[in-house]
């Protein structure tokens, strides 16, 4: 009888622990989906390499706007928070790759003197800071963006082929 009670306690403990892990994974996935929604809703901020806006990391402006740069800082902070959380609860090769892909367009900002000396990095744990440093030093580059239409510019029609 005592053995059955101990087994039940162990089983209950394992179930509670697994439920907590599942909840953390679900929260991390939702946070990641939110970063993707933010990227979709803010194309100027989501990928500076597309040159949809003029980023000045020294002056801390985007298209001359300090306010837009502040939004960019919050955008990047959201990506970093989601990245740290997802890598903590799901440290898989696939998530590692996905996070690196999302961070790569922000490499110049993340390596900028301003960001490196801002104190922002101190809010992240040592494991994530080490991951970030390694990811940003990776010489592999994200492939160049496709020839995309610029927002607000007239669209050119494709020429007919004979």
Summary of predicted features, one role per range:
Residues 1-8:
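Alpha-helical transmembrane segments of integral membrane proteins
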Residues 14-162:
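Amphipathic alpha-helical "stem/stalk" segments
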